[in-house]
Amino acid sequence: MTIFEELKARGLVFQTTDEEALKKSLDDGQVSFYTGYDPTADSLHLGHLVPILVMRHLQLAGHKPYALVGGATGLIGDPSFKDDERSLQTKETVKNWVQSIRSQLERFIDFKHGDNKAQMVNNYDWMGKITFIDFLRDVGKYFTVNYMMSKESVKKRIETGISYTEFAYQIMQGYDFYVLNQEHAVTLQVGGSDQWGNMTAGTELIRRKANKTAHVITVPLITDATGKKFGKSEGNAVWLDADKTSPYEMYQFWLNVMDADAIRFLKIFTFLSLDEIEDIRVKFEAAPHERLAQKILAKEVVTFVHGQTAYQEAVKITEQLFAGHIKSLSAKELKQGLSNVPNYAVKSNDNHNIVELLVTAGIVNSKRQAREDLQNGAIYINGERIQDLTYNLSQQDKIDNELTVIRRGKKKYFVLTY
């Protein structure tokens, strides 16, 4: 199976320019290709993972990746299929975000080994030097307004209004492709399906200005079995930065994937061979309640993004929380596992009597309710049932001197911090 056939079989190809010519190019020898990442935040998120995975697949097949961070385009904002114009960020903010994204990409793509080691480029290095007049003369003249207006991403914004700044974005991205083609012999761009218009602006510029052929592969927008855009957890983006989305949260995200999506996502998001995935499918369909596919999916993705140690920690947190073994976890692990539960910062003058504290922390509404819950055995401190109405929280209840976990009933967790 060729690399292109592999990408298609995994569901990683949505659209391409001349497919036969592209396949021949990939089969004939090493291809230099690039993917661009605009710094729109201080971290990449799950939506960026699919093009990253395609980059890695192509690199493993011997092709040479260029990771472009948009130090210039990030100052402008891509209008593609956005309802409103992006807020412009300061140069300092974009510069900091560029550095964060560079650091993240270095975890996923090999920048150190072999003749196809990846290279990082920043489009501010050439965009920052070209004058406005030169840009209009040497780049702008190759694009007709009719051609630019025909792009679906622009059409959708014309009625509501689009600034010239955003209208010109496709030319900037096209110029990126042209520069990389001239300076690094890059002949292929990989990106999201929403980038088709911007990416083909690059192939058009290379054709008209350099009389060369270049190619584009877009990856699909990933949706779940219900058609909902995939990559958010309870409305929040799943980030690739452990400080924004912990490895435990990411592990839980993949563990909760619907049965109907699990095998498809194994093909898209992991490097397991298609034969291995077929074996998993057979076992999974025989006993879906065991959630084998989801467990393997969670393991593979969390390990790829955060490493083996983070994966093992996520499994430990999951198992110990499920068993109620709070004291077997460190404060750091509990912060991951209970990051979304209500918490209360205990003040130095708070009464540490359990009845008083349950009310003060907002765990129950009244002292009467607190006493009833305690007497009924519904209150647990760090996994241990407390029924003594006179119990006072003390130093021994502080895990790593940082927090105490209170559980009310079977599933309602609360965290007290000090």
From Swiss-Prot:
Gene, per the UniProt record: tyrS
The keyword Cell membrane is assigned to this record: no
Protein name: Tyrosine--tRNA ligase
Record-stated family: Belongs to the class-I aminoacyl-tRNA synthetase family. TyrS type 1 subfamily.
Superkingdom of source: Bacteria
CDD domains in alphabetical order: S4, TyrRS_core
An example Gene Ontology biological process: tyrosyl-tRNA aminoacylation
Subunit structure: Homodimer.
GO molecular function terms attached to this record: ATP binding; RNA binding; tyrosine-tRNA ligase activity
Domain (S4 RNA-binding) ranges: 352-418
Lineage: Bacteria, Bacillati, Bacillota, Bacilli, Lactobacillales
Motif ('KMSKS' region): 229-233
GO cellular component term of the entry, any: cytosol
Localization in the cell: Cytoplasm
Task performed by this protein: Catalyzes the attachment of tyrosine to tRNA(Tyr) in a two-step reaction: tyrosine is first activated by ATP to form Tyr-AMP and then transferred to the acceptor end of tRNA(Tyr).
Keyword Cell cycle carried by entry: no
Motif ('HIGH' region): 39-48
Residues engaged in binding L-tyrosine: Y34, Y169, Q173
